[in-house]
Regions:
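An acidic, phosphate/nucleotide-engaging active-site surface
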Residues: 209-258
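Electropositive, gly/pro-rich neighborhoods at or near active sites that engage anionic ligands
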Residues: 2-154
Length: 263
């Protein structure tokens, strides 16, 4: 099995954590926070633990040392509302496309930009630009052909969601999938509770995800990913029994890399 934690993961975690540390005015506290992050990274098992595990531990450190809880409620409403406002227009664009599935995939991929855990400067203007540019973004033809072949045979799809806003674009993709593959049953999996700006049940309800899929929580608190070993027996069984999994976002993919499922 390939390793799950790389040197690039260390650099990314340190940069995002230092960006948050800049808001700490007490230098002694800031030092303890950064030292705690270094300790978390040092204690990671690169063979079995992916970067979202470190993220989870850093969230606990911030809570215990600084008494801080990340609150992205307003940001979530902003981006969910933005995509919902555009939804009829995007829906029409996908339906009119020469290849509706490809168009829906490209839009859903553009939504992955809305990641406040990785980027320090996420803004609606850049998101709009990305959605306008998606038709020019190439899709791997071999992977796309494989996906279509597997969808033609699949009866069940587990869709692991990532961020707010993006989840509304995921809804459009699922809607497109179900129109093209009417027998496909879709299970949407969201975070157990708020962490960073990841999609939760509240976000799913806000964008009407339940209109196109069965929506469940993953049951894992404070983890920006989907770690099979941390899932409840019932949720894990549903993922293992799905014919196909779509894992949106880096955190979900990192946790599931090499897991043996059809991701």
């Amino acid at each position: 099995m390939p390793r799950k934690f790389y040197a690039d993961c260390v650099a990314c975690l340190m940069q995002s954590s230092l960006n948050k540390a800049n808001a700490i005015t007490d230098e002694a506290l800031r030092y303890e926070y950064v030292r705690g992050i270094c300790r978390i990274i040092q204690e990671m098992d690169p063979e079995t633990e992916a970067a979202p595990i470190a993220d989870s531990r850093i969230v606990h450190l911030r809570r215990e040392l600084l008494g801080l809880e990340d609150d992205y409620t307003e940001i979530k409403h902003l981006y969910n509302g933005l995509i919902l406002q555009l939804y009829p227009q995007l829906q029409a664009k996908v339906r009119a496309a020469a290849d509706p599935l490809r168009a829906a995939i490209q839009l859903a991929a553009a939504g992955n930009y809305i990641d406040f855990g990785v980027l320090s400067d996420v803004n609606p203007e850049r998101l709009m630009e990305l959605m306008d540019e998606v038709a020019e973004k190439p899709v791997s033809e071999s992977e796309y052909a494989q996906l279509r072949a597997e969808l033609a045979e699949a009866r069940t799809l587990a869709y692991l969601h990532d961020n707010c806003g993006e989840v509304a674009l995921d809804k459009l993709l699922i809607e497109t999938l179900r129109s093209l593959y009417p027998r496909l049953q879709v299970l949407s999996v969201v975070r157990e509770r708020p962490i960073l700006n990841d999609a939760t049940m509240e976000d799913a309800e806000e964008v009407g995800l339940n209109e196109v899929a069965e929506v469940i929580r993953n049951g894992i608190p404070d983890l920006p990913g989907t770690q099979l070993s941390s899932l409840s027996e019932s949720v894990r069984a549903r993922l293992e029994n799905a014919d196909l999994l779509i894992a949106k976002g880096q955190g979900n993919f990192e946790c599931l890399a090499g897991c043996g499922l059809n991701v």
